[in-house]
Design a protein with these regions (language model features):
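Active-site helical microenvironments for divalent-metal-assisted chemistry
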Residues: 1-237, 241-258
Length: 258
C-alpha cells in the first residue's frame, strides 16, 4: 500500500483523482472476489513498473519473487496492443492473453483493472478514445471474463461498454426496456413469490432473486438471431440460491415438476 502510494506520488487520473486511487479500487474489486493476499498485493502494485520509476528488482526484494512475477505479468499484458476489430483477430488476441497468463491470478488482476477503467471511462474527454477502449473491452475482456467463468464481471464489462460502442442502439433498447419495465415489473415479483411458495411447500429454504436481462445481451439476440425485443421470452432472469449441492438438485427437481 505505502510503496504503491509513494511510487505513484502526485500522478493524477483523468478524473483528477490521485492515481493511487486506481490500484486501490482494483484491489477492492479483487478483495470482493475473496482472492488471496498475493493477488491483492499485486493489484496494489500492478502499475508501478509500467508507470513509475519502481523496478522489478525493488518489488522482488520487498515483496518476493512470486509477487514480482505477477506484477511483471500484468505489465506485459498491458503492453499488448489490440488494433484489429475483426472477430478472428479478437479471438487470436484473447488466446494470446490466456497463453501469457501462466498464473490465472494475473489475468484476474488485468480484468479488475479494466473493470475499474470502464467504471471511470466517462472522465476521458475524447469520445474516440472512449469508444476505442469500450470496443476493446467488448471484443477482448468481456469474452475473456466469460471464458474463465466470471459471469457477473462479463455482464458489467458489457453493460459499461455497450453505450460507447453502439450509442444509438443502446438508447433505443433502453427506451423500450423502460417501457416494458413499467408494464412488467409486477410479473417479476409474481414469479418470485410463486417460486418461493413452491419451495416452501417442498420444505426448501431458498432465496429467489430476479433481474432484468442486460441490454447488450438483448441487443445481440436482436442483431444476430433476428429476434425482436417483444418476442424475447427471457427478458427476466431468476436465480435460486440454496445452501448446498444437495439442495440445488432438489430445487431443480421441484422446478422441473412444477
Amino acid at each position: 500500500y505505502v510503496f504503491s502510494m509513494k511510487a505513484h506520488g502526485t500522478q493524477k487520473r483523468a478524473s483528477d483523482d490521485p492515481y493511487f486511487s486506481h490500484p486501490l479500487e482494483v484491489a477492492g474489486i479483487l478483495t470482493g472476489m475473496q482472492l488471496d493476499c498475493d493477488t491483492i498485493v499485486t493489484a496494489l502494485l500492478h502499475d508501478t513498473i509500467e508507470d513509475t520509476v519502481a523496478t522489478y528488482e525493488q518489488i522482488e526484494e520487498l515483496f518476493g519473487t512470486n509477487i514480482a512475477r505477477m506484477v511483471d505479468g500484468v505489465t506485459k499484458l498491458s503492453e499488448l496492443e489490440y488494433t484489429s476489430e475483426t472477430l478472428k483477430q479478437a479471438e487470436n488476441f484473447r488466446k494470446l492473453l490466456l497463453a501469457m497468463s501462466t498464473d490465472i491470478r494475473v489475468l484476474l488482476v488485468k480484468l479488475a483493472d479494466r473493470l475499474h477503467n470502464m467504471r471511470t471511462l466517462h472522465h476521458i474527454q475524447k469520445s474516440e478514445k472512449r469508444s476505442r477502449i469500450a470496443r476493446e473491452t467488448l471484443d477482448i475482456y468481456a469474452p475473456l471474463a466469460e471464458r474463465i467463468g466470471m459471469q457477473e464481471l462479463m455482464n458489467e464489462l458489457e453493460s459499461l461498454s455497450f453505450p460507447h460502442v453502439y450509442p444509438e442502439a443502446y438508447e433505443s433498447i433502453m427506451k423500450r426496456l423502460d417501457y416494458l419495465h413499467d408494464n412488467t415489473e409486477n410479473i417479476r415479483d409474481e414469479v418470485i413469490n410463486e417460486l418461493e411458495k413452491i419451495f416452501l411447500k417442498n420444505h426448501l429454504e431458498v432465496e429467489v432473486v430476479g433481474r432484468r436481462k442486460q441490454p447488450y445481451s438483448i441487443w445481440k439476440k436482436i442483431t444476430y438471431r433476428n429476434v425482436s425485443l417483444e418476442n424475447q421470452a427471457d427478458l427476466f432472469a431468476f436465480r435460486v440460491i440454496v445452501d448446498g449441492a444437495e439442495d440445488c438438485y432438489r430445487a431443480l427437481g421441484v422446478i422441473h415438476d412444477y
